[in-house]
Design a protein with these regions (language model features):
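Structured catalytic-domain cores with a bias toward divalent-metal coordination
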Residues: 1-282
Length: 282
């Protein structure tokens, strides 16, 4: 008989994180309006190889679909959940291709269930509306089990970004240096260091505050699927796993024709941003 992928439906508190191999789950978050659930896809991979180093690998969490109209992260994370082979890996990888499943289904930035932007809902609230409960799940059950957090974004229908990995200014020099090293592994043309004052409640804000090696990024725009952006996100995550000895193979350079390393762009202060002075067509 052909191999079949079995997906288990469970509550957040029932999610088993330590099962060897690759397991697919749909994590159920109850709806506020009726007896029903929003099912968040979660893949947990515990590698079957022994770690190549004395210390254990840090564990990596990868998120797509934090905003539902940003598709590159959803595609890359889903492909990784299918393609990563635990026989070639050690350590733990957690993949969530559609963190805000309801906004992904609606192809919009905010959840139609509660009107909340998932990337403004952290640290979450276990008794809040569904977006806040999902954020609380990430903070209390996902973050404690990993040391590296990757949140893959794109411009949706409102922003035109060059393909870039990104992170916030970090006060701790050791954490900042390691984040910069990991950001380069996506081999994007640019790495953006952007102001943490632009918004609050971000997934990456919470991960950074907890000392995680935290990477964001913008891998497309215009509510399409940018093939090059998907490639950088997909191969970038694999490069991160190779960097920490969690996946066999050598780090891959995604643009061999480019002789230089990714260019760092700093926009760390509010004065680096120019808001539109009035509504209109620009």
């Amino acid at each position: 008989m052909p191999n079949r992928t079995v997906t288990t439906v469970c509550n957040p508190s029932e999610l088993p994180f330590d099962t060897p191999g690759k397991q697919h789950y749909q994590v159920a978050f109850h709806l506020d309006s009726s007896w029903g659930y929003s099912l968040i896809p979660v893949t947990i991979i515990n590698g079957l190889r022994p770690p190549p180093r004395i210390s254990s690998p840090p564990g990596v969490a990868v998120f797509g679909g934090t905003h539902g109209n940003e598709w590159e992260g959803q595609v890359a994370a889903k492909r990784l959940s299918c393609d990563l082979d635990p026989a070639e890996m050690c350590g733990r990888v957690i993949l969530i291709p559609q963190l805000s499943e309801s906004s992904c289904s609606a192809n919009q930035r905010t959840s139609p269930l509660d009107g909340v932007n998932m990337n403004r809902a952290f640290p979450g609230n276990p008794r809040g509306t569904i977006s806040y409960r999902i954020a609380n799940f990430v903070k209390t059950l996902i973050f404690p089990r990993v040391g590296v957090v990757i949140d893959i974004h794109s411009g949706g229908n409102e922003a035109l970004f060059p393909i870039c990995s990104s992170f916030h200014p970090i006060a701790d020099p050791t954490q900042r240096a390691e984040i910069a090293t990991v950001a380069r592994l996506f081999d994007t043309p640019f790495v953006m260091i952007y102001s943490s004052q632009m918004a609050s409640g971000l997934l990456t804000d919470e991960a950074e505050a907890e000392g995680k090696i935290t990477i964001g990024g913008e891998f497309g725009f215009a509510e399409g699927v940018n093939r090059q952006g998907v490639k950088h996100a997909y191969e970038g995550v694999k490069n991160v796993l190779r960097h920490y000895g969690m996946l066999t193979g050598e780090i891959v350079k995604l643009d061999p024709a480019r002789s230089t390393s990714p260019r760092f762009m700093s926009a760390e202060n509010l004065s680096d941003y120019i808001p539109c002075p009035r509504s209109g067509i620009w």
